[in-house]
């Protein structure tokens, strides 16, 4: 006779995300794209989105050529109406939304003393206010889901100073603060809000800054694993945070960095 399990949930399905409806903001390239394909590979219904229609169409076709388990619709996190239209289209097709991933981001490298206010505000509009817009827009369907999840993508710049990217670092630090605040504020609405901090992952956003540069070489030296991250290596953390395995985790940050933040002297 089987021994009764002491757990109140089925532990065999703890990390199951099959058929969860996941919307990814900013997923036409880089880590967002890797998250889209990785989560779809685990059986989730994945709706990637972004501003670049050609790249988005190719990604949707890769996820599901028939289009039954995805939706191809551009959106812009700088525009609330665009976000709302995406939300409504997803609800019309699938009837619910379980997970929101905020991966949209821009950056630039410039001495802070010469950075214009317009440059600062433009970056904040995407990297910080865009996250807020999406969270507000998707709040109600995530609440109705009963297992709503928000996963915000932050940065090592939230913890370490990087030369001449002050606006980006400030925006991502604010994203972590927003994550903690919403994690507490929306906990009793059944929405868990967490963040992932990627380590050094070459993407379209940063490749010119870190590949074959003194900055990149220093980052590798400070990473105990001695290499850059691979896009697919961020997917595991997202699977956890999107699953029932994270139903008592909120307002927290998972760092996926090959040991960078824990590092002291590596040689």
Task: Name these PLM-found stretches.
Residues 155:
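Residue(s) in the substrate-gating loop at a strand-loop-helix junction
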Residues 135, 171, 179:
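Active-site helix of classical SDR
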Residues 111-112, 116-124, 150, 219:
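Substrate-binding pocket helix/loop in short-chain dehydrogenase/reductase
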Residues 140, 184-188, 247:
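Alpha-helical segment proximal to the catalytic Tyr-Lys
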Residues 5-13, 160, 239, 250-267:
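Short C-terminal tail/terminal secondary-structure segment
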Residues 42-59:
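Conserved glycine-rich Rossmann-like NAD(P)H-binding loop of the short-chain dehydrogenase/reductase
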Residues 21, 28-29:
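Conserved glycine-rich cofactor-binding loop
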């Amino acid at each position: 006779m089987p021994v009764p399990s002491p757990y109140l949930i089925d532990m065999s399905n703890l990390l199951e995300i099959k058929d969860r409806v996941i919307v990814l903001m900013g997923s036409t390239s880089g880590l967002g794209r890797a998250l889209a394909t990785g989560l779809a590979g685990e059986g989730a219904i994945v709706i990637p989105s972004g501003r670049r229609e050609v790249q988005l169409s190719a990604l949707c076709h890769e996820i599901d050529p028939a289009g039954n388990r995805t939706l191809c619709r551009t959106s812009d996190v700088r525009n609330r109406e665009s976000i709302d239209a995406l939300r409504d289209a997803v609800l019309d097709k699938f009837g619910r939304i379980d997970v929101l991933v905020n991966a949209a981001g821009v950056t630039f490298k410039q001495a802070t003393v010469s950075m214009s206010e317009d440059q600062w505000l433009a970056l904040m509009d995407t990297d910080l206010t865009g996250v807020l817009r999406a969270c507000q827009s998707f709040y109600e369907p995530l609440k109705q889901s009963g297992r709503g999840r928000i996963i915000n993508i932050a940065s090592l710049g939230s913890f370490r100073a990087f030369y001449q990217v002050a606006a980006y670092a400030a925006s991502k630090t604010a994203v972590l603060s927003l994550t903690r605040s919403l994690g507490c504020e929306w906990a009793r609405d059944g929405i868990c809000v967490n963040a992932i901090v990627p380590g050094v992952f070459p993407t379209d956003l940063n490749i010119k800054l870190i590949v074959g540069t003194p900055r990149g070489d220093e980052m590798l030296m400070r990473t105990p694993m001695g290499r850059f991250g691979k896009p697919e290596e961020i997917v595991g953390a997202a699977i956890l945070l999107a699953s029932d395995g994270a139903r008592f985790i909120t307002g927290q940050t998972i760092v996926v960095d090959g040991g960078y933040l824990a590092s002291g002297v590596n040689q």
